[in-house]
Amino acid sequence: MIRKMLQGKLHRVKVTQADLHYEGSCAIDQDFLDAAGILENEAIDIWNVTNGNRFSTYAIAGERGSKIISVNGAAAHCASVGDIVIIASFVMMSDEEARRWQPKVAYFEGDNEMKRTAKAIPVQVA
């Protein structure tokens, strides 16, 4: 059996640019990509916490240290500057691998200040 698992996640980053006329994609600060283990040109899902939109695109590297999150092309209709989003990538693996798998998660606050990284998502308390 093959399972689709969360590979990496940027939790609650803020959109800094939305460029309808750029070639598409989402430019992400290289430091953020590294923290979540997301590669340039990798498929990503973006979930807009601010307006509820959910869409897919691919990651491109933004300038390291710039804190850029630029939603480009047609996807710019789905996010505005200042929106809070979650960016995730996924990986396919065997059931055996999945049971040992730990995603890379980076948590953000304010103006894209990375507060911490983790290799697990905390259990949600009832």
Curated annotation (Swiss-Prot):
Textual note on the cofactor: Binds 1 pyruvoyl group covalently per subunit.
Modification Pyruvic acid (Ser), positions: 25
Entry EC number(s): 4.1.1.11
Processing and modification events after translation: Is synthesized initially as an inactive proenzyme, which is activated by self-cleavage at a specific serine bond to produce a beta-subunit with a hydroxyl group at its C-terminus and an alpha-subunit with a pyruvoyl group at its N-terminus.
Record: active site: 25, 58
GO biological process: alanine biosynthetic process; pantothenate biosynthetic process
Main subcellular location of this protein, as a coarse class: cytoplasm
Superkingdom of this protein's organism: Bacteria
One CC-aspect GO term: cytosol
Subunit structure: Heterooctamer of four alpha and four beta subunits.
Pfam families named in the record: Asp_decarbox
Recorded name of the encoding gene: panD
Cofactor: pyruvate
Catalyzed chemical reaction(s): L-aspartate + H(+) = beta-alanine + CO2
UniProtKB keywords: Autocatalytic cleavage, Cytoplasm, Decarboxylase, Lyase, Pantothenate biosynthesis, Pyruvate, Schiff base, Zymogen
Protein's name in the database: Aspartate 1-decarboxylase
Localization per record: Cytoplasm
One GO MF term: aspartate 1-decarboxylase activity
Family recorded in the similarity comment: Belongs to the PanD family.
Functional note: Catalyzes the pyruvoyl-dependent decarboxylation of aspartate to produce beta-alanine.
Pathway annotation from the record: Cofactor biosynthesis; (R)-pantothenate biosynthesis; beta-alanine from L-aspartate: step 1/1
Residues binding substrate, per UniProt: 57, 73-75
